[in-house]
Amino acid sequence: FRRVLFRSERGYIEQLWREEKYHVLLHSQQSYQMIRNALKTDLSLHQVQQMIDVALLIEPSIGSVCNAFDHMWGYLKKCANEEERQQSKLLKADFINGKIDTQTLLDFLAELANKYDVQYLLQSRVLNTKRKR
């Protein structure tokens, strides 16, 4: 019986991480790595949620936003057309130069994830504003 409960909680932990990993990465690669490594141990759902909540308090840097953008773009670049690839480069450059904000980058990724039905990204809270806390 105990094993069934553990598997169930583990499933919730994996779902939570699947939904929040890019949100965490957007805020801090160090927190992302720390949580990823901690997930290899026996943590409770509550502990994982607490770690995520703490990570989300960190102010995103230009580098952390670009890193998260690049990771998510990796799921889209194969299906994106040439115009979208060019737009991706321009948007990233505009972000680095302070011409656009983080949300503009995320909206671009969300639009393409929807267009190409990239479920892995669509499950991410950072791209799914309707599910953001």
Regions found by a protein language model. Name each.
Residues E9-M51:
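Intrinsically disordered, low-complexity, mixed-charge
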Residues V4-L5:
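Short, small-residue-biased leader/transition segments that mark boundaries at the very start
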Residues K99-K130:
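C-terminal amphipathic alpha-helical interaction region
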Residues A38-A93, F108:
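Long, compositionally biased charged/polar accessory segments in the mid-to-C-terminal portions
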Residues F1:
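Active-site histidine-anchored catalytic micro-motif
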Residues S31-Y32, V65, F69, S88, ...:
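Short runs of predominantly hydrophobic/aromatic residues within well-ordered alpha helices
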Residues L76-R85, I96-D101, V118-L122:
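Fungal-biased detection of long, low-complexity, Ser/Thr-
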